[in-house]
């Protein structure tokens, strides 16, 4: 594979990881938000990175937890308060 094509593929993967599509949003009684996003390959580190990049959308909330429910779905829990 050509270097230019490889760089383009790498940038495409980064763009897909940085812009998860929120498919489900639910509030819990503790005023927490479960942000569900699709990423290419969901592992603990890629899910954490995806949640870290989506913090800009959830300003004023702290990341409480994150996990993968299957190979492509990442859950990020953002809560208000301490």
Curated annotation (Swiss-Prot):
Signal peptide: 1-26
Gene Ontology CC annotations of this record: extracellular region
UniProt entry tagged with the keyword ATP-binding: no
UniProt keyword list: Antimicrobial, Disulfide bond, Fungicide, Plant defense, Secreted, Signal
Highest taxon, organism lineage: Eukaryota
Protein's UniProt keywords contain Acyltransferase: no
GO biological process: defense response to fungus; killing of cells of another organism
Disulfide bond annotation, renumbered to this chain: 32-79, 42-68, 47-74, 51-76
Subcellular location(s) per record: Secreted
Protein family: Belongs to the DEFL family.
Protein name: Putative defensin-like protein 134
């Amino acid at each position: 594979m050509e270097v230019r094509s490889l760089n383009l593929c790498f940038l495409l993967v980064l763009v897909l990881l940085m812009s998860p599509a929120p498919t489900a949003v639910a509030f819990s009684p503790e005023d927490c938000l479960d942000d569900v996003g699709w990423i290419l390959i969901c592992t603990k580190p890629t899910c954490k990175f995806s949640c870290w990049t989506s913090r800009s959308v959830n300003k004023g909330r702290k990341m409480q937890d994150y996990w993968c429910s299957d190979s492509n779905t990442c859950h990020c829990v953002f809560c208000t308060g301490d």
